[in-house]
Amino acid sequence: MINDIQKRTAERMQKSIEALKHEFAKIRTGRAHPSLLEHIRVSYYGNEVPLTQVANVAVEDARSLAVTPWERNMVQAIEKAIMTSDLGLNPSTAGTVIRVPLPPLTEERRRDLIKVVRQEAENGRVAIRNIRRDANNELKAALKEKLISEDEDRRSQEQIQKTTDQFIKEIDKLLEQKEADLLAV
């Protein structure tokens, strides 16, 4: 039972880390990355679908992306979706390939993005701590029902705290890497 709680706790914490990595991937650094356009939705025969379902997004060079629609008639819709996104990008079309140049980040924009990244990291830490609290509550309930001894409860809480510390360190490391990416010119 204790092992189940610890295993479930570690799995949930790992999912929180994955969610944080996904959020970090959306935040633009100075380099081009296909995940930058992942959240853009395109009108496709009356339905809103993710850009990645109607086109191939590839890195052309460090500061530009190439979007190649799978259907010729989608070029205008994709171009419009990129322009109206909150990324402030200005695509240009050459035949069926849409080139998306990424303007360099201003110092002010970098500072704003660092604030956003720090907030996302803090949200990740809070999620990890909430998972720890849930696990500790499960242990207390098991102790109350006499399913585990006080020693087992204490040992398990210490183990869960170690796991929590490990995942918080991982979040701090991810934050440090993302900040370094944002500050790199």
From Swiss-Prot:
A GO CC annotation given for this chain: cytosol
Matching SUPFAM superfamilies: Ribosome recycling factor, RRF
Keywords assigned: Cytoplasm, Protein biosynthesis
InterPro entries noted in UniProt: Ribosome_recyc_fac (IPR002661), Ribosome_recyc_fac_dom (IPR023584), RRF_sf (IPR036191)
Pfam families: RRF
Gene Ontology molecular function, alphabetical: ribosomal large subunit binding
Biological process, per Gene Ontology: cytoplasmic translational termination
Subcellular location: Cytoplasm
Record Gene3D superfamilies: 3.30.1360.40, Ribosome-recycling factor
Role summary: Responsible for the release of ribosomes from messenger RNA at the termination of protein biosynthesis. May increase the efficiency of translation by recycling ribosomes from one round of translation to another.
Family: Belongs to the RRF family.
Name assigned to this protein: Ribosome-recycling factor
Source species taxonomy: Bacteria, Pseudomonadati, Pseudomonadota, Gammaproteobacteria, Methylococcales
